[in-house]
Each structure stands twice: as C-alpha cells, then as structure tokens.
Regions:
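C-terminal cap/substrate-recognition subdomain and adjoining C-terminal extension
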Residues: 88-201
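Flexible, charged surface loops at secondary-structure boundaries
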Residues: 5-9, 74, 125-130
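N-terminal pre-catalytic "stem/leader" segment of glycosyltransferase-like enzymes
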Residues: 32, 75-81, 85, 192-201
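Active-site neighborhood of HAD-like aspartate-dependent phosphohydrolases
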Residues: 2-56, 159
Length: 201
C-alpha cells in the first residue's frame, strides 16, 4: 500500500506521557491529603504517588500539549507514537493511560492520532531505530540511550511545547548535521554490542 511505503520514510517521534503530555501535578492536586499521606514514604524516603489508584484518570494535559501534537501529526514528515511507562504496582494506571489518550486525542477510532499507537514499557531503548526521536522529561527507563535524539522536555533548551514545535517544524538539524549524528549513534551502537559488560551472562 502507498501509505505503508510513505511511512517508511517518515521520522518516528515517540512522546512520553507523565509531565510531557500529562500534567501529573494536576491529578495529584485532586487527591485528598489523607490518601496522599499513605503513599508519601514507605521507609525508603521516596514518594509513590503514581501508585494511587485512579490518579492518572484525574490528570489534565500539559499546557500546549494537545495543540502541539496535532501540529506534529499534521506534518507529513512525522509518524507519532506514545512511549510511556506505567507503574508496576498500579495495574489500573495502565488502563487509565489508555483512556486518557482516547479522551484527549479522539483515539477511540482509527482516525485518531494515537489509535493503537500507545506503547507502555520499562525499556524504551528497545524502540530505538533509524529516524526515531523521543520527547521525554527524564533520562530513565532506557530513554537515555536515545542520546542526541532525545528531546528532554522541561530543560533549558526545551522548556515547553512551543520550543519543541520550533525544533521539529522550524529548526530540525540540517542534513549534514543529521548525517554526523547518525554516524555517531551507529558507532555508539556497534561499540555497545562489543561491550561484554552489557551482555547477559
């Protein structure tokens, strides 16, 4: 099919959910304090708010996120997917994330931007291939391996969705810069294959 052939030449943009598409704090603000207190410290000094049942269903989009995604989706150069992680201790969050995508991106039918294009994994690096980018706020769960193809949301370079749109639509690196970066990525990838420390025993 022509559509399938065209997709082969598109850049894939993976987009994280928490604090990239989704405003985590907006959901947390709606949770009663007595419930939040149960997830604030389990003896490790860490908060586990993402384990609160139903919290993801309460969250709102990050400012500008919905319009920005629609702009990227309308650009013929890109093919969009959501690449996110869901908490292992909160099974309901996996379903809540799907429902959130359906709600805000009309993805309950095959005309939706993210219809059957939601990937939930703790190993985002498994999705690395040619012409792939990741918009993520953290270098965790394999996102750090995207290296120069990681657009780290919330940083000085990419503080908001306007800056992300400017990069992908107005300021994507030139063909010369992309060639150099692709060569660097390929070299790093081949070196990792030769590194015995990264191989399973």
């Amino acid at each position: 099919m022509q559509i399938e052939r065209d997709n082969r030449f598109k850049h894939i943009i993976y987009i994280d959910m928490d604090n990239v598409l989704v405003d985590f704090q907006s959901g947390l603000d709606k949770v009663p304090q007595e419930i939040k207190a149960q997830y604030e410290d389990d003896g490790t000094g860490k908060q586990h708010y993402d384990d609160i049942p139903g919290i993801f269903s309460l969250m709102e989009p990050m400012p500008g996120a919905v319009d920005a995604v629609k702009a990227l989706a309308a650009h013929k150069r890109y093919n969009l997917y959501i690449l996110s992680t869901a908490p292992w201790g909160n099974p309901g969050a996996w379903a809540d994330k799907l429902e959130w995508v359906k709600k805000y991106f009309d993805s309950d039918n095959n005309d939706g931007i993210f219809y059957k294009k939601l990937i939930l994994t703790h190993h985002k690096n498994l999705c690395i291939q040619r012409r792939t980018w990741l918009i993520d706020d953290r270098k965790a769960h394999g996102s750090q391996h995207f290296e120069h193809h990681l657009v780290q949301f919330g940083t000085e370079k990419f503080p908001d969705w306007d800056s992300v749109i400017d990069f992908f639509i107005g300021g994507l690196p030139s063909s010369v810069e992309r060639t150099a970066r692709n060569q660097a990525w390929a070299t790093h990838f081949l070196e990792s294959l030769d590194d015995d420390s990264e191989k399973p025993e």
